[in-house]
From Swiss-Prot:
Keywords: Cytoplasm, DNA damage, DNA recombination, DNA repair, DNA-binding
Family: Belongs to the RuvA family.
Region (Flexible linker): 144-164
Reported function: The RuvA-RuvB-RuvC complex processes Holliday junction (HJ) DNA during genetic recombination and DNA repair, while the RuvA-RuvB complex plays an important role in the rescue of blocked DNA replication forks via replication fork reversal (RFR). RuvA specifically binds to HJ cruciform DNA, conferring on it an open structure. The RuvB hexamer acts as an ATP-dependent pump, pulling dsDNA into and through the RuvAB complex. HJ branch migration allows RuvC to scan DNA until it finds its consensus sequence, where it cleaves and resolves the cruciform DNA.
Disulfide bridge map: none
Gene: ruvA
Main localization category: cytoplasm
Organism: Roseobacter denitrificans (strain ATCC 33942 / OCh 114)
Renumbered residue ranges of the record's region Domain II: 65-143
Assembly and oligomerization: Homotetramer. Forms an RuvA(8)-RuvB(12)-Holliday junction (HJ) complex. HJ DNA is sandwiched between 2 RuvA tetramers; dsDNA enters through RuvA and exits via RuvB. An RuvB hexamer assembles on each DNA strand where it exits the tetramer. Each RuvB hexamer is contacted by two RuvA subunits (via domain III) on 2 adjacent RuvB subunits; this complex drives branch migration. In the full resolvosome a probable DNA-RuvA(4)-RuvB(12)-RuvC(2) complex forms which resolves the HJ.
Location within or outside the cell: Cytoplasm
A single BP term in Gene Ontology: DNA repair
Gene3D superfamilies associated with the record: 5' to 3' exonuclease, C-terminal subdomain, DNA helicase RuvA subunit, C-terminal domain, Nucleic acid-binding proteins
Pfam families: HHH_5 (PF14520), RuvA_C (PF07499), RuvA_N (PF01330)
UniProt-recorded name of the protein: Holliday junction branch migration complex subunit RuvA
């Protein structure tokens, strides 16, 4: 299975791009948010990928971060949510926004995605609420282009390419609260609330804000 692809961006459409890898063109479907973050045509691009194989179709989906890829995998595991709906949700909310919406049980935020109705949105939140803490705790590793190789397809079993580790303040705050003994679901909801109100907060500020929300009322 192809886990990451690096090559030159040949063209972009409304829902996909064509990436040339040593003369072979790979059609990669992406969310609107991911498409907007990609470089211009002719430049080198790197994406984490997920391959969908069915009897009648084989499609490759691309993501700029492992967190986005993991949410796509989880979203498409929900009954009634296909790849198109998953990309719509990720395009509307982004990976962090999906984490916050699901941790807080905010199905209205999920419903804002094109083609996602209230029943599906509620099912997404209900089915994935317990998954949010583990995804929020992931290091948000971003797909990067290795300077020595602009044309390579990297399989998941191959040696890993250089990556930039950038643990988010959200992940660090969640880890700290878990170490303090808070339940994963409670910690995730508190961090999600704090991150929504303080999007640029550093880890210590995010922890303090989350602790205020976890403090007993009264």
């Amino acid at each position: 299975m192809i886990g990451k692809i690096t090559g030159r961006l040949e063209y972009r459409a409304s829902d996909h791009v064509l990436i040339d890898v040593r003369g072979v063109g790979y059609l990669v479907f992406c969310s609107e948010r991911t498409l907007a973050a990609l470089p211009g045509v002719g430049e080198v691009v790197a994406l984490y990928t997920d391959l969908l194989v069915r009897e009648d179709v084989m499609q490759l989906f691309g993501f700029t971060t492992l967190t986005e890829k993991e949410w796509h995998r989880l979203l498409t595991s929900v009954q009634g949510v296909g790849a198109k709906a998953s990309l719509a949700i990720l395009g509307t909310l982004g990976a962090d926004g999906v984490s916050r919406a699901i941790a807080l049980g905010d199905w209205n935020a999920v419903k804002a995605a094109k083609g996602v109705g209230p029943k599906i949105a509620q099912r997404v939140v209900l089915d994935l609420k317990d998954k949010a803490p583990s995804v929020m705790g992931m290091s948000d590793t971003q797909a990067t282009v290795a300077a020595q190789s602009s044309d390579a397809v990297i399989e998941t079993r191959a040696a890993p390419s250089p990556v930039v580790q950038n643990p988010s303040a959200q992940a660090e705050a969640l880890s700290a609260l878990s170490n303090l003994g808070y339940a994963p679901g409670d910690a995730a909801a508190a961090v999600a609330q704090a991150a929504g109100e303080l999007p640029d907060a550093e880890t210590p500020d995010l922890i303090r804000a989350a602790l205020k929300r976890l403090a007993p009322k009264g």
